[in-house]
Amino acid sequence: MNAELYITKASLQISKGEIDKAVDSMMKAIEIGNDMISATKAHCFLGEYYFVNQDYASSKEHLEWIAQRQEELEAECDDLLNDEIDKANLLLDMMETFSLIE
């Protein structure tokens, strides 16, 4: 399976409430690494998931992956990933503002 299919699979798992399985699918999408768009979506999902579950170190790792590539993503993908980029920046700002991360 390619990364895009793992993202689709994760979306279906989320709709069924199978969040742990969705996390596994998103991790597989990242491991495959053949699609920047799918990897960005997976990192965003995982960053948000870990943030909600108060695992701020893991959240930061995934969200910083997006933030570090923001210019490249904006140049290559136009506005396709704006939501993911905005969410990553917002959550990183929140973690910094409330001293949730070092």
Which positions does each model-derived feature cover?
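TPR/TPR-like (Sel1-like) alpha-helical repeat modules
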Residues: F51-A75, L90-D93
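Alpha-helical segment of the N-proximal tetratricopeptide repeat
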Residues: N2-D24
